[in-house]
């Protein structure tokens, strides 16, 4: 249990969770990797001095710089995108670069194969509870002007303890030939909205409708359009208990299974696809 710095009063809440008075309902705001030093952001990190660094004193704090070559591919956007590329057979993503461990637990060398299960301990959005929940994707309505969408989800407490759950809605945007030509960066999945339920007694349900701003699906084109763009193609919404679960649900709706390298079979009924014609 990670508690940060709760203070003296906050420890009452910690005790309530530990002794079962209340069920935990928090979720991770980042991915927990087995070795974050192998992520692109850390591999690109360095102390690169300016050629005229000697003209400045160290206290000026301007004698070196960083190149953020990883772009948007930090945190879960890196791990989930690389995983999806492996399942979809894109770009040799299974190569050993950035690999932490082989399946047998040994540290990988040149012949290692990148495996999501060996790299990620807890995905983004992961959380624990003393009870269990089941969610259904009831309805998705895309506004005629393509500016907003409504996603309706029902959450049911299927366990024996009262508790809260979060409705997490993720999105996937099409990765087009145009995107490849102009090096536009897109994550295989991105959190698009979320909301927590009220405390649900065992057997109780709650239906939540999330209002989604579709402008958040845009990507920045720095090489050609010099602005944010929305590509024509197939878009996906998915509900999941975390980023990886939601991505697996999207991949399942695309016909992928563990036979294609998925860590687990997804639930296609928790995914919704729709077309954007531009």
Task: Show which residues each predicted segment covers.
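Intrinsically disordered, low-complexity Pro/Gly/Ser/Thr-rich segments with frequent PxxP/GP/PP motifs
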Residues: 167, 177-222
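Short coil/turn motifs at secondary-structure junctions
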Residues: 158-160, 174-176, 215-217, 244
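Short glycine/proline/serine/threonine-rich loop/turn segments at secondary-structure transition edges
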Residues: 216-236
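Conserved aromatic beta-strand anchor motif in extracellular beta-sandwich/beta-rich domains
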Residues: 169-173
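Secreted, periplasmic, or luminal enzymes acting at the cell surface/secretory milieu
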Residues: 1-149, 154-164, 229-240, 246-249, ...
């Amino acid at each position: 249990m990670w508690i940060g710095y709760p203070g003296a009063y906050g420890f009452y809440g910690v005790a309530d969770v530990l002794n079962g008075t209340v069920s935990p309902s928090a979720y991770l705001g980042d991915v927990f990797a087995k070795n974050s030093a192998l992520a692109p952001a850390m591999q690109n990190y360095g102390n690169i001095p300016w050629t005229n660094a000697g003209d400045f004193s160290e206290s000026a704090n301007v004698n070196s710089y960083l190149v953020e070559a990883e772009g948007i591919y930090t945190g879960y956007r890196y791990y989930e995108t690389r995983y999806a590329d492996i399942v979809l057979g894109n770009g040799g993503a299974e190569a050993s670069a950035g690999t932490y461990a082989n399946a047998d637990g040994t540290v990988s060398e040149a012949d290692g194969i990148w495996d999501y299960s060996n790299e990620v301990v807890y995905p983004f959005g992961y959380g624990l509870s003393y009870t269990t929940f089941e969610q259904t994707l009831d309805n998705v309505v895309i506004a005629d002007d393509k500016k907003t969408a409504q996603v309706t989800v029902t959450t049911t407490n299927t366990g024996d303890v009262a508790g809260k759950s979060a409705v997490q809605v993720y999105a996937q945007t099409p990765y087009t030939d145009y995107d490849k030509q102009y090096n536009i960066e897109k994550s295989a999945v991105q959190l698009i909205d979320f909301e927590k339920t009220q405390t649900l007694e065992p057997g109780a349900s709650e239906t939540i409708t999330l209002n989604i701003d579709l402008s958040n699906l845009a990507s920045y084109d720095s090489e050609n359009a010099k602005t944010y763009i929305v590509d024509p193609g197939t878009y996906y919404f998915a509900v999941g208990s975390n980023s990886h679960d939601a991505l697996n649900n999207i991949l399942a709706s695309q016909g992928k299974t563990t036979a294609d390298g998925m860590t687990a079979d997804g639930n296609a009924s928790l995914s919704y696809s729709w077309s954007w014609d531009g």
